[in-house]
Amino acid sequence: MKRHRISIPYVTDQVLRNTSDVVDPNDTVDQLISDDVVNPKQDLKEFLDSRELNYRTRASLASSYDDDDWADSIVDLSQRPHNKMEESSLHDDKAIKQATQLNTDYNQLRSPNANSIGGQSVIKDVSSERKPPVNQIPEDQQIYPSQMYPLLEVPESYHSLIPKLQFFFKYYGLYEDSDYVVDKDNQGYYFYPTKKWTTRDQKELMDNISKGVDHDDNLLDLEEKTSDNLFEENLNVHQLVDFVTKGFYVEKRNIKGKYYFDINNPSLNINKIANVDCQDKILSAKEKIDMIFKASGIYRAMKLKAKW
């Protein structure tokens, strides 16, 4: 029987020193993305396809793109404020009890008569003053949609969707910080930006909408102002900008929600959407939604396997 010899190549010092041909895949992807951004001749579709391909390459190992089981691995971010509040309240209760006991013992030692309470200080039990839950609107406080600037409104029966939406908003940076509130009747959830987008000057907003009309400093109720043709279609406004400011319903399987886009939020890239040449085209609602989500950078993540 003839014996076959197998040659095994060994790594030499020369091979280890010769690293000029080694290419880092991460650098390649970054270079492709930078080329897509700085190249003005590139078509919008090619740019979006390349971004989607890069996203799929980077996220293929971390996500299954399954709309049913993907939400199970998402942490419910709404529980964090409650847990922190409960922990802080427990620590506050312990601290208050300890301070009360120490002050009582100290005052009893200083008092000439043990039965006299003249030298004892009255300590207010702060623990009895409970703050309302973070995600609950107080009943005595009137909240208008114009104050919350809701991005998404979903009914109470679809509460399982809330963690996934929070994950999308935070991960893709739609807002600096996203949270939701529950109305006082527990009939719906309202997503709204909690930090800098809620500090918008309401008086300036009212002056821009209806000039020459006196208003008080109360918040503007957008639902009541719809009868005054607040969102009346303007031929001078780009159709996509006009479309996103009105709001639109989206049905994702059995989940229905109404999306509102604030044109004053630069994170949604309204200018980029408006620069898309579609003035001479009649776009359907689905095509508009596709263009909006593609330009805002969340089309692939929000779509998954669902049908818009």
UniProtKB/Swiss-Prot annotation:
Phosphorylated by host kinases. Phosphorylation play an important role in facilitating trimerization and possibly P-L complex formation. Its main location: virion. It comes from the Viruses. Keywords: Chaperone, Host cytoplasm, Phosphoprotein, Viral RNA replication, Viral transcription, Virion. It is found in: Virion; Host cytoplasm. GO terms for biological process: viral transcription. GO terms for cellular component: host cell cytoplasm; virion component. Essential component of the RNA polymerase transcription and replication complex. Binds the viral ribonucleocapsid and positions the L polymerase on the template. May act as a chaperone for newly synthesized free N protein, so-called N(0). Plays a role in virion assembly. Homotrimer. This trimer is stabilized by binding to the L protein. Binds N(0), and N in ribonucleocapsid. This is Phosphoprotein. The lineage of its organism: Viruses, Riboviria, Orthornavirae, Negarnaviricota, Haploviricotina.
